[in-house]
Amino acid sequence: MELMSSLGSLLASSLPIEKKQHALVELVLHTYQPQQRTALFKTVTEYRRNQLELLFPEHQAKSDSVMFEVMDYRDLIQRYPNTLSTEVALLEEAVGQCYIHWLDFWCECEISAIKAKLPLSTHALYPMDLPIKDSAYYGVIIDQIENSQLIVQTPTRPQGLPISDAIALSNLEVFIKGEKWYEMLPLLHLSQTGKHFILLKHPTDEAFPTLVSSALIQDWSKYETWLSYAPPFCNDKWKYSLSRRGYEGLAELHIFTPPALSKCDSIPEFDNKFQLQLAEMQAVCEILRLTVSGNIQQKVYFLYLAQKEMLNLLHQAGYKIGFTIIDQPLILDFYKAIEPQAYLPLGYCDLNETNLLTYRGLWNIELMLKAFNHVNFRDYRRCLRENKNTAWQII
């Protein structure tokens, strides 16, 4: 009843939109416990997604970012009021006043929930020095991030955060809010658990190391939940592209029984044969959610250094193959320029029919590491600067 009253007052108020947004987020965070909040967001997301698929069946295979923007959210909730409960219907009405759609609101709530654990003090707002200097940084792979006692700061949050919260916040700000990868919201726990690579700046005058890059590493023991094997990334819409030399490169790794994969005609067929013939399970992983922080030039540098550091650590740990999903062709062009056989392209697909391709492929970790060890950041930057596929202003 208190929530209903507060929502009614908020809807009737003439507060500026920014203050309304803040008040609505605070109301939800104070009303629902974390598990209740997650259940609420998942339930309404599924309810509206199913509804939108019925209304626009031609878009039902597309991403959440596309589905939730095919119809104005305020029009949607007015024409099709929520039938889950009166409380949820009123909440959606308030969300419609303040946010683009439900998933945009969910993202903001999760960001605020993490930031609320340690409010940002005014004296902490100072420019952070992130030098373009390899020796200023170091990489680490942490097996169970949820059990780590490591405290870090981030370029946008110069106060100590548990590493699991720092990674989740980075994923929220970079991928979900920045790239609109809303499918990550119900899987946010993956940012706070399991195996992760992190790139840290050595503390100088700061109290904590600074997190500038992270990536999720999933071992073969979890392959059933890999993104690579999720339906949108493993179907016949994908154009299969593994070359004859790619098959030879896989055979040379000696991870299959029998040692060579027979030629495949599709991504699903390749995935099936790979799973059936894989004998050296500990040599294979999936690498996802590679985030980098900073301004454009810093991001370019951290993308280079994070890959180099991570490859070194993966190789030391005995990994031979890393599954990847990449949506930036400039990265693939760089791989091809430094060592054509280090990256094995499996296929590509225009997932949302927007003329933007997503690529599935494999890192040959040993070859990729050797290639990175023979280039420096100047080479990397020159390659990107000359690349017609990049929208980044590389100087």
Swiss-Prot record:
GO biological process: quorum sensing
InterPro entries: AHL_synthase
Reaction catalysis annotation: a fatty acyl-[ACP] + S-adenosyl-L-methionine = an N-acyl-L-homoserine lactone + S-methyl-5'-thioadenosine + holo-[ACP] + H(+)
One Pfam family hit: AHL_synthase
Highest taxon of the lineage: Bacteria
GO molecular function: N-acyl homoserine lactone synthase activity
Top-level class of the enzyme under EC nomenclature: transferase
Keyword annotations from UniProtKB, A to Z: Autoinducer synthesis, Quorum sensing, S-adenosyl-L-methionine, Transferase
Catalytic activity, EC: 2.3.1.184
Family: Belongs to the LuxM / VanM family.
Protein name: Acyl-homoserine-lactone synthase LuxM
Species, as recorded: Vibrio atlanticus (strain LGP32) (Vibrio splendidus (strain Mel32))
Lineage: Bacteria, Pseudomonadati, Pseudomonadota, Gammaproteobacteria, Vibrionales
Gene expressing this chain: luxM
